[in-house]
Amino acid sequence: MSEAHNELTHLDAAGHARMVDVGDKAVTAREAVARGRVVMQPETLALIMDGKLPKGDVLAVARVAGIMAAKRTAELIPLCHLLNLSHASVQFTPDPASNALEIEATVRCQGQTGVEMEALTAVSIAALTIYDMCKAVDKTMQIDQIRLIAKRGGRSGDWQRPR
Protein backbone atom coordinates (compact mmCIF):
# COMPACT_ATOMS: atom_id res chain seq x y z
CA MET A 1 0.00 0.00 0.00
CA SER A 2 1.26 3.45 -0.81
CA GLU A 3 1.62 6.04 1.91
CA ALA A 4 -1.35 8.00 0.53
CA HIS A 5 -3.61 4.97 1.00
CA ASN A 6 -2.58 4.63 4.66
CA GLU A 7 -4.03 8.03 5.57
CA LEU A 8 -7.47 8.36 7.11
CA THR A 9 -8.95 10.89 4.71
CA HIS A 10 -11.94 11.74 6.90
CA LEU A 11 -9.74 13.18 9.68
CA ASP A 12 -8.05 16.58 9.64
CA ALA A 13 -4.55 17.26 11.03
CA ALA A 14 -6.00 17.58 14.55
CA GLY A 15 -7.87 14.29 14.29
CA HIS A 16 -11.32 15.84 13.87
CA ALA A 17 -13.88 14.39 11.48
CA ARG A 18 -14.28 16.20 8.18
CA MET A 19 -15.91 15.66 4.83
CA VAL A 20 -13.23 15.17 2.17
CA ASP A 21 -13.05 18.03 -0.36
CA VAL A 22 -13.55 16.48 -3.81
CA GLY A 23 -14.06 19.82 -5.58
CA ASP A 24 -10.85 19.58 -7.61
CA LYS A 25 -11.39 15.98 -8.70
CA ALA A 26 -12.49 15.22 -12.25
CA VAL A 27 -16.01 13.99 -12.90
CA THR A 28 -15.70 10.39 -14.09
CA ALA A 29 -17.91 7.33 -14.48
CA ARG A 30 -18.13 5.44 -11.18
CA GLU A 31 -19.57 2.01 -10.43
CA ALA A 32 -19.61 -0.25 -7.38
CA VAL A 33 -20.96 -3.74 -6.78
CA ALA A 34 -21.60 -5.05 -3.26
CA ARG A 35 -22.97 -8.34 -1.97
CA GLY A 36 -24.30 -9.81 1.23
CA ARG A 37 -26.68 -12.53 2.30
CA VAL A 38 -29.35 -13.52 4.75
CA VAL A 39 -29.04 -17.06 6.10
CA MET A 40 -32.33 -18.60 7.21
CA GLN A 41 -34.25 -21.80 7.75
CA PRO A 42 -34.95 -23.71 4.51
CA GLU A 43 -38.68 -23.27 5.07
CA THR A 44 -38.27 -19.49 5.25
CA LEU A 45 -36.34 -19.41 1.99
CA ALA A 46 -39.09 -21.48 0.36
CA LEU A 47 -41.79 -19.11 1.66
CA ILE A 48 -39.91 -16.13 0.23
CA MET A 49 -39.33 -17.74 -3.16
CA ASP A 50 -42.95 -18.93 -3.36
CA GLY A 51 -44.27 -15.49 -2.33
CA LYS A 52 -46.22 -16.95 0.59
CA LEU A 53 -45.17 -14.79 3.52
CA PRO A 54 -47.98 -12.95 5.34
CA LYS A 55 -46.33 -9.52 4.89
CA GLY A 56 -46.31 -9.78 1.09
CA ASP A 57 -43.68 -9.88 -1.64
CA VAL A 58 -40.46 -9.81 0.37
CA LEU A 59 -38.17 -9.48 -2.64
CA ALA A 60 -40.09 -6.61 -4.22
CA VAL A 61 -40.13 -4.64 -0.96
CA ALA A 62 -36.46 -5.39 -0.20
CA ARG A 63 -35.44 -4.38 -3.74
CA VAL A 64 -37.18 -1.00 -3.43
CA ALA A 65 -35.79 -0.51 0.09
CA GLY A 66 -32.25 -1.17 -1.15
CA ILE A 67 -32.60 1.25 -4.05
CA MET A 68 -34.07 3.92 -1.77
CA ALA A 69 -31.21 3.38 0.69
CA ALA A 70 -28.59 3.86 -2.04
CA LYS A 71 -30.21 7.20 -2.88
CA ARG A 72 -30.17 8.30 0.78
CA THR A 73 -26.71 7.11 1.81
CA ALA A 74 -25.46 10.65 2.48
CA GLU A 75 -28.23 11.04 5.08
CA LEU A 76 -27.26 7.80 6.83
CA ILE A 77 -23.43 7.87 6.72
CA PRO A 78 -22.33 11.22 8.18
CA LEU A 79 -19.29 12.01 6.00
CA CYS A 80 -20.55 10.66 2.66
CA HIS A 81 -21.09 13.06 -0.21
CA LEU A 82 -24.55 13.51 -1.71
CA LEU A 83 -24.33 11.93 -5.17
CA ASN A 84 -26.52 12.14 -8.25
CA LEU A 85 -26.91 8.43 -8.96
CA SER A 86 -27.60 7.37 -12.53
CA HIS A 87 -28.34 3.71 -11.69
CA ALA A 88 -29.12 1.55 -8.67
CA SER A 89 -30.26 -2.05 -8.81
CA VAL A 90 -30.69 -4.85 -6.29
CA GLN A 91 -30.83 -8.50 -7.30
CA PHE A 92 -31.52 -11.65 -5.28
CA THR A 93 -30.29 -15.19 -5.81
CA PRO A 94 -31.49 -18.06 -3.64
CA ASP A 95 -28.76 -20.42 -2.44
CA PRO A 96 -30.60 -23.50 -1.13
CA ALA A 97 -27.32 -25.31 -0.39
CA SER A 98 -26.47 -22.61 2.19
CA ASN A 99 -30.07 -21.83 3.19
CA ALA A 100 -29.34 -18.26 2.17
CA LEU A 101 -30.66 -15.48 0.00
CA GLU A 102 -27.78 -13.71 -1.76
CA ILE A 103 -28.15 -9.96 -2.35
CA GLU A 104 -26.21 -7.96 -4.95
CA ALA A 105 -26.40 -4.21 -5.50
CA THR A 106 -24.92 -2.26 -8.40
CA VAL A 107 -24.72 1.53 -8.28
CA ARG A 108 -23.43 3.99 -10.89
CA CYS A 109 -22.93 7.72 -11.26
CA GLN A 110 -20.90 10.37 -13.04
CA GLY A 111 -19.15 12.04 -10.14
CA GLN A 112 -16.11 13.16 -8.22
CA THR A 113 -16.23 10.38 -5.65
CA GLY A 114 -17.08 6.69 -5.65
CA VAL A 115 -20.35 4.89 -5.00
CA GLU A 116 -19.02 2.08 -2.80
CA MET A 117 -20.94 3.24 0.27
CA GLU A 118 -24.15 3.50 -1.75
CA ALA A 119 -23.81 -0.11 -2.96
CA LEU A 120 -22.98 -1.36 0.55
CA THR A 121 -25.90 0.59 2.02
CA ALA A 122 -28.28 -0.84 -0.58
CA VAL A 123 -27.26 -4.40 0.33
CA SER A 124 -27.46 -3.68 4.06
CA ILE A 125 -30.94 -2.17 3.95
CA ALA A 126 -32.24 -4.86 1.58
CA ALA A 127 -30.98 -7.47 4.06
CA LEU A 128 -32.56 -5.67 7.02
CA THR A 129 -35.85 -5.43 5.12
CA ILE A 130 -35.81 -9.18 4.46
CA TYR A 131 -35.14 -9.76 8.14
CA ASP A 132 -37.97 -7.44 9.16
CA MET A 133 -40.49 -9.05 6.83
CA CYS A 134 -39.54 -12.61 7.85
CA LYS A 135 -38.80 -12.31 11.56
CA ALA A 136 -42.27 -13.53 12.55
CA VAL A 137 -41.56 -16.92 10.94
CA ASP A 138 -37.79 -17.19 11.53
CA LYS A 139 -35.96 -15.57 14.43
CA THR A 140 -32.74 -17.48 13.62
CA MET A 141 -31.96 -15.46 10.47
CA GLN A 142 -28.45 -14.09 10.18
CA ILE A 143 -27.20 -11.23 7.99
CA ASP A 144 -23.60 -11.73 6.93
CA GLN A 145 -20.85 -11.40 4.34
CA ILE A 146 -21.69 -7.80 3.38
CA ARG A 147 -18.73 -6.71 1.29
CA LEU A 148 -17.58 -4.69 -1.69
CA ILE A 149 -17.08 -6.92 -4.75
CA ALA A 150 -15.80 -4.39 -7.27
CA LYS A 151 -15.42 -0.69 -7.97
CA ARG A 152 -14.67 1.12 -11.19
CA GLY A 153 -13.47 4.63 -11.88
CA GLY A 154 -11.78 7.39 -9.98
CA ARG A 155 -8.22 8.24 -9.10
CA SER A 156 -7.50 4.86 -7.48
CA GLY A 157 -8.73 3.01 -10.56
CA ASP A 158 -10.58 -0.25 -10.80
CA TRP A 159 -10.62 -2.85 -8.03
CA GLN A 160 -11.98 -6.40 -7.90
CA ARG A 161 -12.22 -8.53 -4.74
CA PRO A 162 -9.98 -11.58 -5.12
CA ARG A 163 -11.96 -14.80 -5.34
Curated annotation (Swiss-Prot):
EC numbers for this chain: 4.6.1.17
An example Gene Ontology molecular-function term: cyclic pyranopterin monophosphate synthase activity
Record keywords: Lyase, Molybdenum cofactor biosynthesis
Catalytic-site annotation from UniProt: D132
Chain residues that bind substrate: L79, C80, H81, M117, E118
Entry-linked InterPro entries: MoaC (IPR023045), MoaC_bact/euk (IPR047594), MoaC_sf (IPR036522), MoCo_biosynth_MoaA/MoaC (IPR050105), Mopterin_CF_biosynth-C_dom (IPR002820)
Keyword Cell membrane: no
Pathway linked to the protein: Cofactor biosynthesis; molybdopterin biosynthesis
Top EC class for this record: lyase
One Pfam family linked to the record: MoaC
Catalytic activity: (8S)-3',8-cyclo-7,8-dihydroguanosine 5'-triphosphate = cyclic pyranopterin phosphate + diphosphate
Entry's Gene Ontology BP terms: Mo-molybdopterin cofactor biosynthetic process
Oligomeric and partner information: Homohexamer; trimer of dimers.
Described function: Catalyzes the conversion of (8S)-3',8-cyclo-7,8-dihydroguanosine 5'-triphosphate to cyclic pyranopterin monophosphate (cPMP).
Family stated for the protein in its record: Belongs to the MoaC family.
Name of the protein described by the UniProt record: Cyclic pyranopterin monophosphate synthase
Species of origin: Chloroflexus aurantiacus (strain ATCC 29366 / DSM 635 / J-10-fl)
Encoding gene per record: moaC
